[in-house]
């Protein structure tokens, strides 16, 4: 878990089920991506991201929009039911192959793919840095920010992702969107203060293992939020929830921003610290999707430019978060 003035270990939250919500919503995802740019250590990498900060923040929500309009198999890449089937988080298989062997392909897919998606996207960012492709770097870094943010959202790491199992239905979007929208300034101020007391540093562990650390912590935080939620459905519930759990949201957002900045820094270092351009002309519309490296995990190899668009697949999960 994240410790102050020490290299960050991401703590994440992955959830499984059907939830009509965007993880952290636009407010939270933009906050995390923007803050990560500010937290990078002084140097060429920070200069590059500060020059593209508005794009990285504004397009932080793009992966959610993308999964609704472009790829039906994108949904499970945004969460992980780390407690699926009563599994203890520390006992959940750490490889996709092991997960499929334990649960079967259908169940494994419905339970989510987030930690491997983070690793896959991180590898794509390293490749983009090596290619010195500025557009790919900015776009892939933006997508990575979304996935890292998802991992730190407590209700993206547990099966009771919307409180249905405990009579608290609606808690997911209330925690990640409504509460943030109603208390944006306070949460941003507190999260930034926390983040500045943490250390952005090269991640020296395996990125998948790093993501699992985040998810394990997120699962714990989900149970804490559920315990503190009074379950009332009054119009003032956002205020009550903020008073009870606002500190958890602030901490997770701070940790997500530090984790993201650390992963950006690590990708740049692993690529050999290439020189970066002063300006980048990004395309309009949704940020370009990163290259998917693992065909089995991704639901198929990337489509070649001259291939016809395949017939749209049915969603692999009933979750919409």
Where do the language-model regions lie?
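Preference for short coil/turn "hinge" residues that link or interrupt alpha-helices
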Residues: 14-15, 148, 168
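Functional cores that coordinate and move charged inorganic groups
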Residues: 143-149
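Short linear motifs at secondary-structure transitions and domain/linker junctions
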Residues: 11, 149, 236-239
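N-terminal, motif-rich segments that launch catalysis or mediate targeting to/interaction with membranes
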Residues: 20-143, 154-254, 258-321
């Amino acid at each position: 878990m994240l410790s102050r003035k020490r290299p960050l270990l991401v703590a994440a939250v992955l959830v499984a089920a059907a939830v009509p919500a965007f993880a952290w919503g636009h407010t939270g995802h933009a906050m995390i991506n923007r803050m990560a740019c500010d937290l990078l250590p002084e140097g060429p990498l920070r200069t590059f991201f500060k020059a593209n900060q508005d794009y990285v923040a504004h397009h932080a929500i793009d992966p959610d929009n993308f999964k609704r309009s472009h790829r039906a198999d994108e949904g499970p890449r945004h969460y992980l039911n780390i407690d699926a089937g009563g599994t203890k988080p520390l006992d959940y298989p750490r490889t996709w192959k092991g997960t499929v062997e334990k649960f079967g392909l259908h169940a494994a897919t419905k339970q989510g793919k987030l930690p491997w998606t983070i690793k896959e996207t991180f590898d794509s960012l390293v490749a983009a840095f090596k290619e010195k492709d500025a557009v790919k770097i900015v776009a892939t870094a933006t997508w990575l920010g979304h996935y890292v943010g998802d991992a730190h959202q407590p209700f993206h790491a547990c099966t009771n992702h919307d409180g249905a199992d405990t009579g608290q239905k609606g808690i997911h979007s209330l925690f990640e969107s409504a509460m943030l929208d109603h208390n944006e300034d306070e949460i941003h101020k507190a999260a930034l203060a926390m983040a500045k007391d943490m250390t952005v540093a090269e991640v020296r562990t395996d990125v998948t293992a790093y993501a699992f650390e985040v998810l394990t912590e997120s699962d714990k935080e989900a149970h804490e939020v559920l315990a503190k939620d009074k379950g009332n459905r009054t119009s003032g519930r956002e205020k009550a929830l903020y008073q009870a759990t606002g500190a958890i949201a602030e901490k997770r957002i701070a940790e997500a921003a530090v984790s993201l900045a650390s992963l950006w820094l690590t990708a740049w270092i692993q690529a050999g610290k290439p020189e970066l351009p002063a300006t980048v002309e990004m395309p309009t519309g949704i940020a370009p999707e990163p290259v998917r490296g693992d065909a089995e995990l991704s639901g198929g190899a990337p489509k070649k430019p001259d291939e016809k668009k395949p017939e749209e697949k049915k969603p692999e999960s009933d979750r919409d978060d």
